[in-house]
Amino acid sequence: DRLDNLTYNELKTVMGTLAQADIINMEDGAKRNDIYEGIATDVNTLAKQYGIGGFAIYHYWFDDNVQILERPKEMFLENKDLDIPFCLTWANETWARRWEGNDKEVLLLQTHTPTKEKWKTHFDYLLPFFKDERAIRIDGKILFQIYRPHLIDKVGEMLRYWRELAREAGIGELYFMA
């Protein structure tokens, strides 16, 4: 509710200093992690201060277990002091230079090979996030968002299989949202 009354420029001021640290290009990994932890703590505090109820954290997973930008969400998972609820949003499309207006230049191809082995490997990676007490639930089910489910071959079969794996892992049901 508190965010409703902020203008764009006020919101930009609130978040601006957090976005200015160039932690991706830092060579010193320990220093980068320290800075990330500080930023994550500040974002957590600001989110609660301004009435944000949780975060949807982007998750990038490609065939053959290729991931990008995984460390920030893993650090979030490891830091229980960041006490804001979260869910993961699988950005499940081909990675191209779309942000530069060049969606023809493919950086990482997303193929969605429809095998239970690949689905299980992906699920096993996600399981610690699903087990986390901060995971957002809807009607008692763990929320997992998929950006473009229609791109996944045999998506219905995959979702049924993940639900089965979730029950076997003892975490209950999954709530899928697109």
Language-model features and meaning:
Residues 1-178:
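Glycan-processing catalytic domains of CAZymes
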